[in-house]
């Protein structure tokens, strides 16, 4: 059976330093409607920003629906499609027995995703996917703005 998505989320994250000031962005499409979400964090990593973009996009949904999340992050896609169930059943431990990195965000994604309604799609970074390119630019600008804001306050 082919599943038709109601909502398309394209997400990306950026970090200046890793760790350092970071930004995230999400483009949500529903029919002809588009909404842009973005933000920044003072000290973070690129992976946390990728995950935050997906969290904020899913959190902004107002009803249950089929969702396609497009990301250039294999870390995010594989975490959600290959590792999450195992991590959860292992008490949030990795295969090596160590605590899963970014557990707090994985748990938020787990709660928001409702695994039967979210499809995770990987596209190559800077591969010409229009929404992904736009999210990349917005996430980078959010990271830069966060860095400027920090400089103004410190």
Task: Describe the residue ranges of each PLM region.
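RNase H catalytic domain
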Residues: 8-21, 55-138, 143
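RNase H-like nuclease fold core
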Residues: 1-48, 52, 56-66, 137, ...
């Amino acid at each position: 059976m082919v599943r038709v998505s109601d909502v398309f989320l394209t997400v990306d994250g950026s970090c200046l330093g890793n760790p350092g000031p970071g930004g995230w962005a999400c483009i949500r499409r529903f029919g002809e409607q588009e909404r842009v979400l973005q933000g920044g964090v003072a000290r973070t990593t690129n992976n946390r920003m990728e995950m935050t973009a997906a969290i904020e996009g899913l959190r902004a949904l107002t009803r249950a629906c089929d969702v396609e999340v497009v990301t250039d992050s294999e870390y995010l896609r594989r975490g959600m499609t290959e590792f999450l169930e195992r991590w959860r059943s292992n008490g949030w431990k990795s295969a090596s027995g160590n605590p899963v990195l970014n557990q707090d965000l994985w748990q938020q994604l787990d709660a928001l995703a409702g695994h039967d309604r979210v499809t995770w799609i990987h596209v190559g970074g800077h591969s010409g996917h229009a929404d992904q390119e736009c999210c990349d630019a917005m996430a980078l600008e959010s990271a830069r703005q966060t860095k400027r804001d920090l400089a103004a306050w410190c």
